[in-house]
Amino acid sequence: MISSNDFRPGVSIVLDGSVWRVLEFLHVKPGKGSAFVRTKLKNVQSGSVMEKTFRAGETVPQATLEKSTMQHTYKEGDEFVFMDMETYEEGRLTRTQIGDRVKYLKEGMEAEVIKWGDQVLGVELPKSVVLEIVQTDPGLKGDTATGGSKPATLETGAIVMVPLFISQGERIKVDTQEDKYISRE
């Protein structure tokens, strides 16, 4: 159990049988009446966001989330097969369990799999990954680093905007959280 006074961004709680992550909180002490905590919560499973007010000192169950490092070994049909790096057990995850970051997932890549009990809530990829460009328009003579950008398709199928001087076959570093080009490799 966790007190509403101990809420911080990133804390996970259980409400109505679902896991919610605290995005924002504000402890309010009005001049008249008792104090309360106004929060903005995000459902970890569905992604929906809601605002909820708790009485100051009210206790709610805290969600115990487990993170385990797993390696993506291969894709079979619509499922992605992961191997636990400690126990060498295999687990299968669907595209919806992984989320929209699946476009950066490459065979052999390690990721943090987040579980609540036996239920997989999501997958955290590394902040940046190095991938090869398989298709992009060729750069023209005179293109500079500040000249603009063009779309490039990566080996995983993801499309990111890259500077005009980047060409097909090059390896680039991409920010997986903001879908942005970082640098050449």
Curated annotation (Swiss-Prot):
It comes from the Bacteria. Belongs to the elongation factor P family. GO terms for molecular function: translation elongation factor activity. It is found in: Cytoplasm. One of its GO terms (biological process) is peptide biosynthetic process. It comes from Nostoc punctiforme (strain ATCC 29133 / PCC 73102). Its main location: cytoplasm. One of its GO terms (cellular component) is cytoplasm. Pfam families: EFP, EFP_N, Elong-fact-P_C. The gene is efp. This is Elongation factor P. PANTHER family: ELONGATION FACTOR P (PTHR30053), ELONGATION FACTOR P (EF-P) FAMILY PROTEIN (PTHR30053:SF12).
